[in-house]
């Protein structure tokens, strides 16, 4: 099964190469969303949590991006450890973790596991990323390093695959839904190899027979977190 997830955080690390044990370096997770799908793309589980800030405030610069204020996270969030235990459980049901530029999210979550001393297999999970040289070659957007095509943003990839904009970035639920749609469409278009997916050629035939046309969104309702934060001020 495929576990697609995304986080919103308090900001960026000082050093992107720092280990996840460097708890002073990595930002805090203030929202996580995930979807678990079976091999044919069927939705098994969808979850979304705000995380109560414990011992820190969400910087206003971060709030301006994702809309999650400290007050909103305290009022509507759950304790970090509760989320980590549930996330660990769903990790155990997945074969792959999937995301857009996923290394950042795995490091953020890995560091949160370290902080709470929760054992987990996140760093050992096989990764399928939607932001790669393969998707860069697919979208063919100029401006990459060394004359290469640039790595596509989620918005750019979504626009290329479905010829429609995606304007809800920086809400983890919306980002996960868009990433999931792109990921499953990339399977349908055979942008991933049988080796990458650890499948036989028969898998792609079954997948395209199950998904005969472009992948559709599952139609989740995404809260306007900026509006929610304003309500409680």
Region spans (language model):
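Extreme N-terminal starter segment of soluble prokaryotic enzymes
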Residues: 1-3
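Short acidic, Gly/Ser-rich segments with clustered Asp/Glu that frequently serve as metal-coordination loops
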Residues: 7-15, 20
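Short consensus segments that form the blades of beta-propeller domains
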Residues: 20-26
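Metal-dependent phosphoesterase signature
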Residues: 63-86
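Metal-dependent phosphoesterase core characteristic of DEDDh/y 3'-5' exonuclease domains
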Residues: 15, 26-68, 88-232
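Acidic-residue sensor for enzyme active/binding pockets
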Residues: 8, 23, 112
